[in-house]
Regions:
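Alpha-helical transmembrane segments in multipass membrane proteins, preferentially the mid-helix core
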Residues: 41-45, 100, 152-171
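Hydrophobic core of alpha-helical transmembrane segments in multi-pass integral membrane proteins
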Residues: 30-48, 66-71, 183, 226-239
């Protein structure tokens, strides 16, 4: 099989479970981050300068790109006989692909809020600390899919804010309800399927959960998500809280 199609399992069998195709913040990783940033900023600027009808077409195009990207991975693994339960789209970022679709179809504020507060930091952190490097090289379906889909997942809610959506810390309980409401069934689903969706089954292969393990131990690493989520929400909402406070002071 060509290296381009190889899954994590085949890579582990051939090169060992500790193999990484490139180092964090090495040349390849920095190029991928730079290209992702240029892509996100470029599309956002184009979107900002576009008419209402053009903005709608761009948002639909990004939604289609997200669905096609997710489908490409699933088809690639299935057609090469490598598909298993771990490729179900049940990680938070994969679920957010369908939240994007639902928002494009229905224009719901709760979707926008969840995508802003959870999807932007989650997808950005995935790009900064990728957990998919245990593949043969950067030129693989898994790596290219992972980079592109996370860049698109940052882009989509950025476009919503550019269009005028104003996030509110008052909606944070809705965001947390979505997060914990989706995490609970997935936690119990991981065990029988031997999967690690939301990184709730084990901390291995992820820089962030590995850090939680060093601090809290393997038994309690999940508790590290709680302060991490709190910090992420504070960072996402702080600019809007400050802006609202300044606006009230001027009045």
């Amino acid at each position: 099989m060509n290296d381009f199609w190889k899954s994590y399992d085949i890579t582990h069998a051939e090169l060992g479970p500790n193999f990484r195709c490139y180092p964090l913040y090495g040349k390849i990783h920095l190029i991928e981050l730079a290209l992702s940033l240029v892509f996100i900023v470029g599309i956002a600027l184009w979107y900002r300068r576009s008419s209402a009808s053009a903005r709608r077409r761009i948002l639909v195009g990004v939604t289609i790109a997200l669905l096609a990207d997710e489908a490409a991975l699933l088809l690639g693994m299935a057609l090469t006989g490598q598909w298993n339960w771990s490729y179900l789209p049940l990680h938070l970022c994969s679920i957010n692909v369908f939240v994007c679709l639902y928002n494009t179809l229905t224009d719901q504020n709760w979707c926008k809020e969840e995508l802003y507060a959870l999807c932007i930091p989650g997808a950005a952190l995935a790009l900064l600390c990728p957990s998919w490097l245990d593949v043969p090289s950067w030129w693989t379906l898994i790596n290219l899919h992972s980079i592109s889909i996370h860049a698109l997942l940052v882009l989509y809610p950025v476009l919503l804010v550019v269009r005028g959506y104003r996030p509110s810390a008052r909606r944070a309980p809705q965001v947390l309800a979505f997060l914990f409401g989706s995490a609970l069934p997935i936690y119990f689903l991981n065990k029988p399927l031997n999967t690690n969706f939301y990184f709730l089954n084990n901390p291995y292969g992820n820089v962030i959960t590995s850090a939680f393990t060093r601090l809290l131990g393997e038994k309690y690493y999940i508790l590290g998500f709680l302060p991490a989520i709190a910090v992420a929400l504070c960072l996402m909402y702080l600019p809007w809280v400050v802006a609202d406070a300044r606006h009230k002071k001027r009045k």
